[in-house]
Amino acid sequence: MERKMNSFKSMSPKEKIIYLLTLVYLLPFFILVAANMLFSMFQTTYMELYLDTEKPLYKSDHPLLLLVLVLLLITGLTYCFKKKEITTEICSAFEKFSLIWAVFISLFIIFLFRVRVACDSAYLSDIAIDFLNGDYSSLTGNGYLVHYPHQLGMIALLEVTYAVFGIENYTVLQFLNVIAIVSTVYYLHRISDEMFHKPQIQILLSLLCIGLIPLYLYTTFIYGDIPSLGLIVPAVYYIVRYLNTQKRIYSIPAIVLMTLSIQLKSNSSIILIAAIIILFLHMICHKDKFVVLFLLLLIGTPYITNTAVNTYYAHAAGLEHIPSGIPKVAWIAMGLQSNDYIENGWYNSYNWDVYTENNFDASATTDACIDSIKQSVQEFAGHPKTCLKFFYRKFISQWNDPGYQAQITIEWYSRHRDDQSDLALYFIYGNGRFILEAMMNFYHFTILLGSSIFAFC
């Protein structure tokens, strides 16, 4: 602690500001990750089968077994690193194996389960087919896109894919997911190269990529998540590359990839915000004037692209403009509502219902949502124990599922086929399901423990 204080005193004013800003996010990050690590040690969240909605359930974990396994893993890795000199060739071999493994296991999952689409994926697929047939009714009345116009980017991808490869060609879309997953694994290695320059870390990363079972299970998931991930990770790499080299050429792929990722999944805007903060701090520290243009394009290009997509579909549908959609505040209000059947703060269709009840008026919907938020806050303020229980259940139900709902997604999608193989059924409903759960649970706990130690140190 004394050494850290002396180091802080020796910093320049700019360095002190950046250090303090780092603590602003690092301390909450440590608290959340450490709490989740403790929860994960004693309890595991999993999803109930055979239902039409997510239903998180909980079971006790085996803390001593988890700790012993982690200790054995650390001991084994330490022994190997000391016994064998880690060369560039060894790192390259591990990376190549992780990439080959990503391709192999992803394709294996595709051809094992041979699933179709369901839930929101089915809505998007049907809308893309309607668009190809000149039917844009989902953009009018109480249509799906009146509520969720942010899905137009993914629908555009589906429309193009169906036009080129045939209607409902889910295999091609799943192959695109494989490409996105390989892109993610490859560029994670490149980011590690840029940030750490340590062969041991490269090998650890390769091993972690091999263990990404939830990601590989999502290969069959036809939605914006996986394609956008395959774009946003390389976008981050090119931003890091620019920060390290200040070569302006890297800003171009960063902007293009970030824009495409946001079009497919609006949640990628979170990464955009993080990139803006980092580039802004870089500009202050290094007096890099080009960052101003970089930031303008990084912010403006997704907006312009989104406007272009909306304008195209508005013209095709004969509308003056695309509906504004459900205000974001509706998700906040829904996330603060109790739910005895599913779980606190989970999706309960409130956002859809409140928007419909207010005749698709964004302003009136916002007012109703703010009232709902105030009501929830007042309830929490008046009943602290209820508040604590609410957020505890919300937290563990969402962040203590080591499978990230990948297994329940496979189960939902598999219902649309009657010819599943015995091996597929073994992993969906049989003991194979529990084997996957155990592997993902150990992986999940290991990641949380390592992240907690890193944030603390």
What are the language-model segments listed below?
Residues 1-108, 291-299:
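Start-transfer (signal-anchor) and selected internal transmembrane alpha helices
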Residues 188-211:
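Transmembrane-helix signature of polytopic, membrane-embedded enzymes
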Residues 18, 53-68, 172, 394-457:
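Membrane-interface anchor segments at the N-terminal boundary of transmembrane helices
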Residues 214-228:
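Short acidic/glycine- and proline-prone juxtamembrane loop motifs at membrane-interface regions
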Residues 175-196, 234, 449-454:
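Transmembrane-helix motifs of polytopic, lipid-linked glycan transferases
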Residues 148, 152, 156, 164-183, ...:
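Loop-to-helix entry region of an early transmembrane alpha helix in multi-pass inner-membrane enzymes
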Residues 313-418:
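Membrane-proximal stem/loop segments at transmembrane-domain junctions that anchor or position
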Residues 113-129, 133-168, 368-369, 388:
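Extracytoplasmic catalytic/substrate-binding loops of multi-pass membrane glycan-assembly enzymes
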